[in-house]
Design a protein with these regions (language model features):
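Bacterial Sec-dependent N-terminal signal peptides
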Residues: 1-23
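Acidic Gly/Asp/Thr-rich repetitive segments characteristic of extracellular carbohydrate-active
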Residues: 25-63
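Detector for repetitive beta-architecture
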Residues: 52-54, 59, 64, 70-72, ...
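Acidic glycine-/aspartate-rich tracts in secreted/extracellular proteins
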Residues: 60-61, 77-81, 229-235, 280-287
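Right-handed parallel beta-helix/beta-spiral solenoid domain characteristic of secreted/periplasmic
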Residues: 70-117, 131-132
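Predominantly extracellular beta-rich ligand-binding scaffolds that present long acidic/polar faces
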Residues: 115, 135-138, 145-270
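C-terminal accessory segments
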Residues: 244-302
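Short, compositionally biased P/S/T/A/G/V-rich stretches that sit at domain boundaries
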Residues: 287-322, 329-331
Length: 333
């Protein structure tokens, strides 16, 4: 219990530092919690961390740093009033013999996150990314999982690597040969008309042509179930070459036939919710397709506790201490 409480204290401390306009990273190692301050707080915490440790970041913008340890990095949430940002490009390169899993939650990464090396099972939950790439053609990362994430630029799926997307928004998915992609309940967009790179397995997904073009269908090596196309030409069938495509209608739908407000232009306030007609299009599980169906409906709220209110008195008590009152918001089920 002591270990759990110490970890929670670290999370809460970091989550509230924005009220003091400070950048704080708390590093939890066993029963010990160490704090680092300033724009390089993340860099310094990562340097001091051991595999299996947890780093909690306050709101604000932190300089990026390369990560080569199976640690957990948490932020204040991507849709909180003051999110956590990691700025500049950085590498994820975990030694393949590291027994711990790398995890990231509740953080906005404003530049490019790059995979390097040979490792498995990194997990990204409730994060927002600009671009995701690979270091070179030798990269082999298996079971890269993104859940409840937004990728507003390009996800470049590296050859010899495997990706799992669960209830995510992806602006551009570029898949190299031999990369394996499985997407469930996702909204997937291309800025152009070419969906030839979308070879993988897709369930309950919505494919959107941003510019309304449609000249190349999905490759016949792909599989799609209970997916729809939006904003393609009326005569174009995105799924025409697929041999496995149950419940994937040939006719494209308009934005207004599916979404409440989305019209192809990304913004941080866009929630990608479906209107009543869109909700009537059911997935393989009998629930709505898109971000809010499936086993893990989209929700950007962090899964760990954060401070929701803090009252600091104007003066100390008769013992010379501050009677600070703290309200904690727990994640909803």
């Amino acid at each position: 219990m002591k270990k759990v409480l110490l970890a929670v204290v670290g999370i809460l401390f970091a989550a509230t530092s924005f009220s003091q306009n400070a950048l704080v990273a708390s590093l939890s190692h066993g029963e010990n919690v160490t704090y680092y301050y300033g724009i390089d707080a993340l860099k310094n915490a990562v340097a001091a961390a051991a595999s299996g440790d947890i780093i909690n970041l306050s709101s604000g913008s932190f300089n990026a740093t390369n990560i080569s340890k199976g640690i957990t990095v948490r932020g204040a949430g991507i849709d909180s009033p003051e999110p956590t940002y990691i700025v500049n490009e950085f590498l994820i390169d975990i030694p393949k013999d590291d027994a711990k899993r790398f995890m990231m939650e509740g953080i906005r990464c404003t530049n490019t996150m790059i995979f390097k090396g040979v490792f498995a099972n990194p997990y990204f939950l409730k994060c927002q990314f600009n671009n995701i790439g690979r270091w070179d053609y030798e990269v082999t990362v298996s079971n890269i999982m993104f859940a409840n994430c937004k990728i507003t630029g390009e996800l470049r799926a590296a050859a010899n690597s495997s990706y799992i997307l669960v209830n995510c928004f992806v602006s551009t998915l570029y898949k190299e040969n031999d990369a394996a992609v499985t997407a469930t309940n996702c909204v997937l967009i291309r800025g152009g008309e070419d969906f030839r790179g979308y070879n993988g397995q897709f369930f309950n997904c919505i494919f959107v042509s941003k510019d309304g073009g449609g000249y190349y269908a999905m490759p016949n090596v792909s599989q799609a179930s209970n997916c729809i196309a939006v904003n393609f030409p009326s005569s174009f069938d995105l799924f025409r070459d697929l041999s496995v495509k149950p419940n994937c209608p040939s006719a494209s739908k308009s934005y207004t036939e599916v979404f409440e407000t989305f019209t192809g232009v990304y913004s941080d306030t866009e929630d990608f919710k479906l209107n009543e007609a869109g909700k009537a299009i059911l997935g393989t599980d009998g629930k709505e397709i898109g971000l809010y169906g499936g086993l893990q409906p989209y929700d950007s709220t962090p899964t760990y506790p954060l401070i929701s209110t803090m009252t600091v008195p104007a003066k100390t008590n008769d013992q010379g201490k501050m009677d600070v009152k703290v309200g904690i918001s727990l994640p909803t089920e």
